[in-house]
Every structure is written in C-alpha cells, then in structure tokens.
Amino acid sequence: MKKMLSIVASTAVALTALAQQAPIAVRWEMGRNGAEKGYYSSRFVIKNVSQSPLEKNWQFYFNQFSRRLKLGDQLPVDIKEVSTTYYQVTPNDRYHTLAPGDSMVVDMLMRGTMVNICYVPMGGHVVMNGDTKKPIGVKIAIAPLDNPEQFQSRPNDYPDGNRMYAFNQTLQDAQAPAHCYDIFPTPKSVTLTGGHTSIGNVVAVKGGKFGDARRFMLDELKKRGVYATGNTSTTITLKADKKLSGEAYEMVVNDGKVLITAGSELGCMNGVKTLISALDHSKANRLENAVVKDSPDFGYRGFMLDVSRNFTTFENMKRVIDLLAYYKLNVLHFHFCDDEAWRVEIPGLPELTDVASRRGCTFDEKEYIAPIFDGNGNPDDLSQSSNGYYTRQQMIELLKYAKSKGVKVIPEIETPAHARAALVAIRLATISMPLPIWQWRSNTKCGTTTTRAFTPLPNHITTMCSTWRMRACSTFYIRWLTNLRRCGKMQD
C-alpha cells in the first residue's frame, strides 16, 4: 500500500512539474572551431519569458559531452560539471535581476572540436529555489549550423548535404532498365523470362513444410490486401529442396505461379522477403516473370541498437524488427544496459529498473540516476528518451516476434566496464572509485574489478538469456591484460 501511495504521489509531482511553464527560454549558438587553440566558441542566450523579474533563485541544467570549460571572469553566471556530461548554470554575484523579456548572453569556450549535431547541449531543465524534485523542462533552441567553420576542423572532414549531393551527381544512370527485382539487398541472379504475373486480392498458398515462413508470408500479404484462399488460379508454393544449403533460395515467377524453393526455414523466409519486396516495387502487384537465385554472403547480418542511452518504446522496437526483417538482416544486437541506464526488468533485482531506468535532476542518485543525453530532469516522464524499461513479458514477446520474422536477438550485458547504472542501482560498497567520476575516464576501464560487484548478475542474466548473450568488455585497460588475477576472473 505504501509503495502504491508513493507511486501516486510521484506521478502527481511529475504531472505538476510538466504543467509548469519554465521562466526562461534558452537558445544555444555555435561560434566557430579553433576560436582559441584547442577550443571552440559557443554561447547561451537566456531570456526571461515569465511575467515577473527573475532573481537569483534559479539554476539551469543541461547535458553535453564532457568538455573542459573556459569562462570569462565577468560572466553573471557560474557553470560547473555536476557529474560527467551534466552541467549546472548558477547566477553569481555579478548577476543582475532579469526583467520580463530581457536576455543575457553567456559566452563559453569548450575544449575540442564541434563536428556533429550530437555535440550540442540537450536535456535542458530549470530548478527554482533549489527544489530538485520539481524540475521544469526547458527545450534548448539550437541555432542553425550554416558555416563550415561551425562543424569542421579540417576541409571535407564531415559529409554535409552539399558534399553528398555533389557526389551523387557523379554517378551515372544505370544502363539496364529497372524492374521489380531491383531491390535491396540485390539478389545475386535475376533472369527475366518475359511476360508478367499479376498477384490479385486472393492467392492459393501451397506447401506446408516451412511453417514460420508461411505464417510470415500470409501476414505480410494480408498487410498488402492479398488474402489466401484455395479458389484461385494464382498460386504461391513453398517447396523444400536439400540441394539448397544454408539460407539460399530460388524463386521462379511464371504465368500466375510463384515457386519458392529452399533447403531451410530461413532460406525460405529469405525467398518470401524477396517476393514481398518485389511486390512493393511493382506496379499494381504485377511481377515480371523471372528466375531469381540468391544466398547471403554473411551468416551474421546484424544491427546494434542502443536503448540504454536513448530509450525507445516497445512498439518502436517491433517496428525496428520489421525493418530488419524486410532488409534481410538477421541479428538484433540489443544494447540495453550501459553507464547511462538499465532497460530490462530482471526478477529478483527490481532496483535495476526502479533506479537505473530513470534519469532525473539529482546529486545523490538515491532514487534515480543523474541525467545524461536528452530528457527534462523529470525521472517519471515516460515521453522522454531518458526514462523507461521493458518488462519481462515484453521481452518474451519481443523475442517471439523477432523469431517469427527470422531475426535473432542477442542481448548485450555490459560488464565489467560501463556497468555504472547497474552498480548505482544495487548500491554495492565494493566500487573502488567515487561514482560521480565516470564515463570516458579510467575507472570505466578498471574501477569495477571486484568479484562481489557482479555476484548478483549471473543467475539473473541466465533467466533472461537462455540461448545467447554478449558480455561486452569494451574498455580493457592495459593493467587488466597484465594482471593474471583479473584475467582469471574474466575467464571464470
């Protein structure tokens, strides 16, 4: 009952915060790279958009890749990095009350080079009177990057739209006329045999060996207004032939009949995907008669999706799987945990999602972790990519959904490096460095080397990943490689 009341109260606070209007509007403007050796210039323009004078009782927070700051000694605000990538802007003694409609400019020099839009500030929010439980979201307006010196440190080091357009202009038109089998990925062999086969609203489907491929095909045809029935002369036949190995298939389209032959379920599914793609690229479902032969060059055709840093919904995950299947990618590398968050419910460790799937304005991280990347400072706002997780039931459904479309899901468990979110959540006292110092620094590589830190994980990991899992060891330090004790732990 107490937990339910806590959730209701938390939600009420979240809705109140969302309903509030921020007293400031913030615009970020890029200056130029190399404004000072090793630094680029930028500025915030902070405007009082409220109806009252803005005193010193506010702090503005934002996220940005960690950069060493250089500030002028006459600025009316101080800027400090609260935790890695999380910055606080606070009025100082030089600050003068901002009247309604007035603005102030905060000029900054930041270490490094601005080369990509992902380097700009994001996740803005303002706190009034030090009340971090009631952050108010501030959408940071980003001024256009119009000049090359704003996003290039060397000539042509970033392929902007003009450069890509000029490159495309150099490509010559294809010599052969296009047909419906000009799809991606392109089949190895397409021989047009003359004539056409029209796929109407109804077809007869024959062959029952490849159940998954058959169900997938019927579902995709239905989405395109084509239904299976036994009373029509247009037929689609799925046939098994052991002479075709692996994921190879052949498809023959001829005078109202489509024959897909394969030696395996996945091979047949590839043939079905070619048929579906050809229909999408045809005019009124009118296929050229042809013999199509194809097989993938790579058994692993993967796509890595990082939902730790930027969460996406369960429905969006299914859409991603749909796209992978359509383009014959067969592996979803599922990066669901990192320093920034843990996104999958694990029975027995509720704190992993109670704490580590939520990011909000905090300095102690007792209830949720500090902001990074986008968000509005509110840990309970599920409209933000900073917050959210997948339930155990959703994960089971996602795995089944992927399998039905010929896609294998490989969850990635980030250990021992980049495991900060999980370690913050389970509050272990075995971490060898202070938690606020992390990401891009050496303790990411070797700060979490004690055995106890990862004791709770193996049993719970196996409940989720009974077939495949990847334990990412992306940031090994040289001291790991020369330390037999640590190497032994990893082997265990």
Where on the chain are the PLM-derived regions?
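Asparagine-centered strand-capping/turn motif at beta-strand->loop junctions
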Residues: 45-52, 468-469
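Short, solvent-exposed loop/turn segments enriched in Ser/Thr/Gly
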Residues: 35-43, 104
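Acidic, contiguous N-terminal accessory segments
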Residues: 120, 124-296
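Feature activates predominantly on carbohydrate-active enzymes
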Residues: 244-246, 250-464, 472, 485-492
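Short acidic, flexible loop segments centered on an aromatic residue
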Residues: 34, 53-83, 122-125
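Bacterial Sec-dependent N-terminal signal peptides
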Residues: 1-23
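Intrinsically disordered, low-complexity Pro/Gly/Ser/Thr-rich segments with frequent PxxP/GP/PP motifs
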Residues: 74-115
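Low-complexity, acidic Ser/Thr/Pro/Gly-rich terminal tails and inter-domain linkers that flank the onset
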Residues: 20-38
